[in-house]
Design a protein with these regions (language model features):
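Redox cofactor-anchoring modules in respiratory/redox and cofactor-processing assemblies
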Residues: 1-87, 92-100, 104-110
C-alpha cells in the first residue's frame, strides 16, 4: 500500500510496480474522523514497529523532539495504520508531513 493513488484505470503499470490495490468507490470514502481511542490497532499493523497513535499526537502538537525520538523518520508510509484505524484518523497524511519536517530539521544540523 505504499504507492500513489491513481484516479482511473488507464494508468500504465511498469516493471517497478510491485502490486496493485483496487478499491471500490465505497472503500475510497473515508469515514468521519473521531478521537483516538488508543486501541493500538495502528501500532499492531505497523511493519516498522512504530506507534502511529503517538506520532500523530506529537505531530498535531508540533512536538518535533518527540517525533524524532520516536523515529517518525523510519516510517515507510505503507498506509497500514490508516486502514486499521477505527477512528478514521488520517494517520498517514499526518505522519507523512511530520516525517518531512523532522527530516528537514535533521538535515539542517549537519
Amino acid at each position: 500500500m505504499m504507492g500513489k493513488a491513481i484516479a482511473n484505470m488507464d494508468a500504465a503499470t511498469v516493471k517497478g510496480s510491485s502490486s496493485l490495490l483496487y478499491l471500490t468507490a465505497e472503500q475510497t470514502v473515508r469515514g468521519v474522523e473521531s478521537a483516538c481511542i488508543r486501541c493500538g490497532k495502528c501500532a499492531e499493523a505497523c511493519p516498522m514497529g512504530l506507534e502511529p497513535f503517538l506520532l500523530q499526537k506529537y505531530a498535531r502538537n508540533e512536538m518535533m523532539d518527540e517525533l524524532e525520538e520516536n523515529a517518525v523518520q523510519d516510517c515507510i508510509e505503507c498506509g497500514c495504520c490508516l486502514y486499521s484505524c477505527p477512528a478514521n484518523i488520517p494517520l498517514l497524511d499526518i505522519i507523512r508531513i511530520a516525517k518531512g519536517d523532522v527530516i528537514r530539521i535533521i538535515r539542517t544540523r549537519k
